Amino acid sequence: MNPSERFFSKLRKLTVYLETESSSLLHTSQNLKEDEEDEETGAQALYQLHSEVRALKRQVRDQVATHDTSSADLRSFIRRCLVLKQRTTEDIDSLKKHYEKYGYRPRISRLGSTEVNCTKEAEERAERDAEKLDAAEEDEETERGDCDKVDQSVTPEKMPPPVDQLQTPKLSDFGLSALQFQRVLGEAEVPLSAAPESAIALSSPPILMNLQPPQPKTPKCSLSMEEDALTPRLEDFGISEYTMCWNNDFTMDLFNKKPPKNRSERNENVLKPHNVFSNTSSVLNKDVANKSLESPEPPEFCTPGFKIAKNHVPSTPLFNGKNDLNSPPRLNNNCPSTPELPAFETPFVSKLIKKEDREEESKIHSESQENSLRLPDLSTTNGTSWNDAPEMPKMLRYEEEALPEMPILQSNFGSSLAFKNTSGESLSRMKTGAGHMLEMKQTSVPVPEDGFNQDWCLSTPKVRVKFPAEPCTPEMPDMSSVTQDILKLVAQCKY
């Protein structure tokens, strides 16, 4: 049912309802004077009628709006379909034109030819049917007239040959009688009747065939290539170019072992003067050279403050002519890690000892002056050992007549010292341990500004027996500079 028909049917019902209500309202309006109740009922009915009419109007408006939207959607859909149809027809025409270049015949022409043929066949069939009807009518008439005549049986043209279902199938049953197949064993049979020429021209098989037993074919086997084979998992044995040098075992170390050195040679190596701290390159070369399995010895470290247990060696640094005396003091490789007492006694160290021990120190000092003082040989670079070093010149007596020329001292303590300035003072000859005599030059020392004079004496190092409760360790650079100043004085006295 169309929406327009539904709309008009509802409208007709509404008009009928309005007419009935209007008639009832007219009737009630004419009879207003009858009862007050009738007036109230009439007003209520009118109000209900107005409300119903308003509701119907709203409903009609909604239906019209929905009908308009649906019709608009339908129109847009139809337009889209028409546009799509036009596009498809254009595409089909372009494809037909493209395929016609390659011999394509459109379907319309084929349908036209088939329709023409069909119409011709239909006309012929209609004519045949009409002829058959005429013949049937004539036959009926003849049958009615000749009822007494014996019906002659019509024999069939040809009876189909009987078919044996259990017969073995032949090539002719499958339409393959025209083809000639070669037998695997034996001679080929010559066909009795010449077969009709077929479209496929096949060469006739030879009459005499080589009677050889059929050989079994070699089975096809896929060749396994080395490239396709799975590669075995590589095992890491830890051998590489970097780790080849680690494979030197203990036996090779025994072959490369060198004979142990004598104690004198070791002392030479120990006392050999270095440039106080050895360079990294020399340390590396030394490590490479000491790969032989010698008896275990404590290694030599250049790091100050690292404690190791090693043999006691003289803590006095060796004097090297190549070293610059103006350079800051350095530590020797043979210097122990813990700070030791200086090799020579100075007045500054005596202040660190308590007053109770000064008497004992004076006795030890007087005894030590009588003993000889030995210094290491300055030519240790030429390969001489510590035992061949000359002895320290022995001080016979201390005269105040003459003093040696005071050199430029490096330590703070040495720079603060002052010496007595006497023009006629001189030192007597000092007898060495080897029997040689060493002469000191008669020089004058300038008097410092503060006017403080103090005697300078060379003595053997004293042994500290008692220490204070909390002894303060002197700074290593100051003590080493003091010893360096003493070495300067000794070198000046010798040369």
UniProtKB/Swiss-Prot annotation:
Stretches with biased composition (Basic and acidic residues): 119-135, 355-368
MF term (GO), any: microtubule binding
InterPro entries linked: SKA3
Keywords (A to Z) from UniProt: Cell cycle, Cell division, Centromere, Chromosome, Cytoplasm, Cytoskeleton, Kinetochore, Microtubule, Mitosis, Phosphoprotein
Localization, UniProt: Cytoplasm, Cytoskeleton, Spindle; Chromosome, Centromere, Kinetochore
Similarity section: Belongs to the SKA3 family.
Subunit relationships: Component of the SKA complex, composed of ska1, ska2 and ska3.
PANTHER family the record matches: SPINDLE AND KINETOCHORE-ASSOCIATED PROTEIN 3
Protein name (database record): SKA complex subunit 3
Residues carrying Phosphoserine: 295
GO process annotations (BP): attachment of mitotic spindle microtubules to kinetochore; cell division; chromosome segregation; mitotic cell cycle; mitotic metaphase chromosome alignment; mitotic sister chromatid segregation; regulation of microtubule polymerization or depolymerization
Main location: cytoplasm
